[in-house]
A protein has these predicted regions:
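Intrinsically disordered, low-complexity regions enriched in proline, serine, glycine
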Residues: 43, 77-78, 94, 110-114, ...
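Primarily EF-hand calcium-binding motifs
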Residues: 5-69, 75-95, 100, 116-142, ...
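Flexible helix-coil junctions and inter-repeat linker/turn elements that act as hinges
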Residues: 39-40, 107, 111, 138-139, ...
Length: 397
């Protein structure tokens, strides 16, 4: 399990700087000399060097670094991260604020250097990390992050972790390469024309056609997006990440809010019986067409109300789903309304497998799904490689 440790406390006063060479330090010497003076991971050093040295060949003097330390390294650690990540001219963190830091991470982290010959994958990895950060932290869809939002989302704890952990796949929050690979491959499977956009017919194929046509319509109409100004009938890669993280981890508070907004067609903040029956009618029709026994809507509604105990007679509000006792059932309730395959799996679940799932190593459904799917993708790729090798051998013979 990946546990983000709390940010360490910094001393309230700066110790005297160690002896500084008489000449300005160019980046290689600067990074060696200053890596222990700056309380951030080494992949922040290129950004700091660029702030202090007007050009790559000017170098940094002792006076410049001393002034920088006295003005930038006296804050709390989360403030240091925030201020050194954002642009000096901006009061907030935008998606582009993270790009220089993540570009540096790609060249510094031992678990990512293999991507150096795959520029396209490097950029998609950066896109993925940024989208995951904003998915977790920018719940209001503002398009930027404040100090408070970063602190609440424990962004810098994840940066600390990726700075000290050599196995990138152990950093499950934001940075795991395996998680990126799963997200990107799932998008790639649906984006058949390779225009980096998903349409409604594309999304209907997700999860072996598990989603109803009505929920797909609503996802495009009301689903939270990374790009608020995107085309309404198209979903970019980052928008797809928002969808997929919500779909495969319905127990998370972020996903609950995502699906509640999608289901709440009139936007009044209440899911009433009419709202839910509209979705269930589509679901029950699909079950009938496939020969499955259909549970009456009234029985589903009664079960739902017994589990979440809504506080209002008018219907269910998002706070009802967010109660601690609803963490384990919210996903099943959503699936009953619009995901046929998962709903049928839930209805026929094996108690032994459910107990095994509760006792496994994963903290949430997304981590579990990503691990299993990555292993599946890796096995498929290995099989394709074996088939190619066999064909080459046969051709040589």
């Amino acid at each position: 399990r990946s546990q983000s440790a709390p940010l360490p406390l910094l001393p309230t006063t700066l110790d005297p700087l160690p002896p500084w060479p008489s000449h300005p330090l160019l980046y290689p010497e600067f990074s060696t000399h200053c890596k222990d003076l700056i309380p951030l991971p080494s992949f922040y050093l290129p950004k700091i060097y660029s702030l202090l040295s007007p050009t790559p060949t000017d170098g940094v003097t002792e006076s410049q670094f001393s002034t920088f330390a006295k003005t930038h390294l006296i804050w709390s650690l989360d403030e240091i991260y925030y201020n050194l990540t954002k642009s000096p001219s901006s009061p907030y963190l935008s998606p582009s604020s993270f790009r220089p830091i993540l570009t540096s991470l790609l060249s510094h982290h031992p678990g990512l250097t293999f991507l150096s010959s795959h520029t396209d994958f490097q950029q998609k990895y950066i896109d993925t990390v940024i989208a995951r950060i904003f998915y977790e932290c920018d719940e209001e869809g503002l398009g930027y992050l404040t100090r408070r939002m970063c602190r609440k989302g424990k962004v810098w704890e994840a940066f600390e972790e990726v700075g000290r952990e050599e196995d990138i796949n152990k950093v499950l929050r934001f940075f795991s390469y395996e998680h990126f690979y799963v997200l990107y491959c799932r998008f790639w499977e649906l984006d058949l024309n390779r225009d980096y956009k998903i349409t409604k017919p594309d999304l209907l194929k997700y999860g072996d056609h598990s989603l109803s046509s009505l929920i797909v319509e609503r996802i495009f109409e009301r689903g939270r997006r990374f790009k608020v100004d995107g085309e309404p009938d198209e979903m970019c890669y980052e928008d797809f990440i928002f969808f997929m993280l919500s779909e495969e981890n319905k127990q998370s508070h972020v996903a609950v809010k995502y699906w509640f907004e999608v289901l709440d067609g009139d936007g009044d903040g209440v899911l009433n019986t009419k709202d839910m029956k509209t979705f269930y009618n589509v679901q029950s029709h699909r079950m009938q067409c496939l020969g499955h026994e259909v549970v009456p809507f009234e029985d589903v509604l009664c079960q739902m109300y017994d589990l979440i105990k809504p506080r209002s007679e008018e219907g269910v509000v998002v706070e009802d789903f967010l109660q601690p006792e609803c963490d384990k059932v919210s996903g099943a309730l959503f699936d009953a309304l619009f995901n046929l395959n998962k709903y049928l799996q839930f209805e026929s679940r094996d108690p032994f497998l459910e107990r095994t799932k509760r006792e496994d190593e994963f903290d949430n459904d997304w981590d579990r799904y990503a691990c299993l799917d990555y292993n599946r993708l890796a096995m498929e790729e290995e099989q394709r490689e074996d088939d190619r090798n066999q064909m080459e051998e046969e051709q040589r013979e």
